[in-house]
A protein has these predicted regions:
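Short, aromatic/basic amphipathic alpha-helical patches
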Residues: 63-72
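An amphipathic, basic-hydrophobic helix/alpha-beta surface used to engage anionic
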Residues: 52
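Short acidic-hydrophobic, aromatic-tinged amphipathic segments that line or gate anion-handling sites
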Residues: 71-82
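Conserved SF1/SF2 helicase motif Ia
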Residues: 48-49
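Pre-Walker A adenine-sensing motif
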Residues: 2-19, 40
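Conserved P-loop NTPase motor cores
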Residues: 12-14, 23-45, 57-61, 80-158
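Intrinsically disordered, low-complexity eukaryotic regions enriched in glycine, serine
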Residues: 4-5, 55, 72-74
Length: 158
């Protein structure tokens, strides 16, 4: 039996500023299967995304995202206020882009952002949060949403 695999190129995942949608990536796998390194590669190949937020339940223990993202944008646990602030910022950015486009026929604002939810399942209340549903379902407001979890715990009901 021969298995043919195509080479996967991270650059093919589109996060272009002029597109009105962004991908949602859900990485599922057992512990130590490389999920964090896939996220790191995505961030490396898309360093031009101007801002992002990381919510990581294991950041205090391993400091993984502190090497990639300014600590100001890293949170150790899920809180509804974090998502509210992200949504509020994105709405403001999109409103400003609309104003500039009406006034000047173009805008120089890059609306892209990323949200990484990493190992947040120790408290699964976030999976039932209405704001999280909005975050996952409204891709036009974000460049990318990445959720990294272990399949055993993954019980989304959208």
């Amino acid at each position: 039996m021969n298995l043919e695999l195509k080479r996967f190129d991270m650059k093919n995942i589109s996060f272009k500023a002029n597109e009105s949608k962004g991908p949602v990536a859900v990485l599922i796998g057992r512990r130590d299967t490389g999920k964090s390194f896939l996220v790191r590669d995505l961030l490396y190949y898309h360093q031009d995304i101007p801002i992002g937020t990381v919510i990581s339940g294991t950041e205090e223990g391993n400091g993984f995202y502190g090497k990639l993202v300014p600590k100001l944008f890293i949170h150790n646990e899920y809180n509804t206020a974090i998502i509210e602030n992200i949504l509020k910022r994105q709405r403001g950015v999109l409103t400003q882009i609309k104003k500039e486009t009406e006034q000047f026929k173009r805008s120089t604002i890059d609306p892209r952002t990323f949200v990484i939810l990493d190992d947040c399942l120790y408290d699964n209340s976030w999976s039932r949060d209405k704001l999280m549903r909005l975050l996952f379902m409204n891709g036009e407001m974000f460049a990318v949403v990445i959720s990294k979890e272990w399949l055993v715990y993954f019980t989304f009901c959208f």
